[in-house]
């Protein structure tokens, strides 16, 4: 492995992403597939690119990601979080801008568990007064 790389772990819902930043031309590969083939939805691709566009480093780095768990939205969020952490490891002065954009904070929202006697987490069976 090259010494000129930066690493960041990102998490969102049940997805975990390991992100490696290396100097390059702007290639993003996720689980050995290009970004455009890995994510079919444009919104997911946009979420992944957000920290790079904010720091104006879209063409500076090649990004290698391994992501597991969760769905499309959770994986995109986890990759964004991992890229943010790797960028901060690369240059600590980027932290302020990334923090203001809200990319540094781990989104702690998780699915609420289903309760016994209820149809879903909070949905109750219909109540009959008589």
Swiss-Prot record:
Gene3D superfamilies from the UniProt entry: 3.30.230.10
Keyword Translocase included in the entry's annotation: no
Record flagged with keyword Transcription regulation: no
One function term, GO molecular function aspect: structural constituent of ribosome
Pfam family, one: Ribosomal_S9
GO CC entries: cytosolic small ribosomal subunit
Domain of life: Bacteria
Protein's GO biological process: translation
Alphabetized UniProt keyword annotations: Ribonucleoprotein, Ribosomal protein
Family statement: Belongs to the universal ribosomal protein uS9 family.
Name this polypeptide is given: Small ribosomal subunit protein uS9
Recorded name of the encoding gene: rpsI
């Amino acid at each position: 492995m090259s010494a000129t790389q930066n690493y960041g772990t990102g998490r969102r819902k049940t997805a975990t992403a390991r992100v490696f930043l290396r100097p390059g031309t702007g290639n993003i590969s996720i689980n050995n597939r290009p970004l455009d083939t890995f994510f079919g939805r444009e919104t997911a691709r946009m979420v992944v690119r957000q920290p790079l566009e904010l720091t104006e480093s879209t063409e500076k780095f090649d990004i290698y990601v391994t992501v597991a768990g969760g769905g499309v939205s959770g994986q995109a969020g986890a990759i964004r979080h991992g890229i943010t952490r790797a960028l901060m490891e690369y240059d600590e002065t980027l932290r302020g801008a990334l923090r203001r954009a809200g990319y540094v904070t781990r989104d702690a929202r998780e699915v609420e568990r289903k309760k016994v006697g209820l149809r879903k987490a909070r949905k109750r069976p219909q109540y009959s007064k008589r």
